Amino acid sequence: MPGSLSSGGFNDHLELRRKNRATVDQYMRTNGEDRLRRHELFTPDGSGGSWNTETGEPLVFKGHAKLAALGVWLHQCFPDWQWHNVRVFETDNPNHFWVESDGRGTTRVPGYPEGYCENHYIHSFELDNGKITQNREFMNPFEQLRALGIPVPKIKREGIPAS
C-alpha cells in the first residue's frame, strides 16, 4: 500500500515526492475543458469526492468512468471554476499531500438559481507513483448553501469568548 512507506522525514524518496507533487500541482491548475481529462491523473481505481455533505457521509466517485462523469458535471455546473491562493504541504509520507486553497466561479447547478461561489478548501491527496489514489475535499458548507441560494441557519453561540 502506498501509504505504508517508512518515513525518513522530508528528505526521503525525493524523486517520488517530486513526481507526486507535480501531479498535485497539475490537479490544482486544471481549469476549463481540461477538467474533462482530470480523471487521467488518478489510478484506474482511484477516488475523489466531497467530505461535506448533508448526509454526513462522503460523496465519493471511484474509478475513471465515475471520475470522468464527475468532470463533465463539474464543467457544466461550475464552468469557470478556478483554484487560487493554492498552498501545497508535503507530509512525512511522500505519497500524501495536503493543499489549502480558495475556489471561485459561477454556479449553474440544476434546481438552483445561477449564482457565484467563493469558498475556502482543504484537499487531501494520497498518491501511488504519480497517480492519485484518493482525493478528499473539505470546504465550508455554509458558503455552498449561500451560493445555491439556500437560507443559512443562525447558530447560537452564547457565551463563547470570540472577538
Curated annotation (Swiss-Prot):
Keywords: Antibiotic biosynthesis, Virulence. InterPro entries: NTF2-like_dom_sf, PhzA_PhzB. GO terms for biological process: antibiotic biosynthetic process. Pfam families: PHZA_PHZB. Signal peptide: none annotated. The keyword Secreted does not apply. Coiled coil: none annotated. Belongs to the PhzA/PhzB family. Involved in the biosynthesis of the antibiotic, phenazine, a nitrogen-containing heterocyclic molecule having important roles in virulence, competition and biological control. This is Phenazine biosynthesis protein PhzA. The gene is phzA.
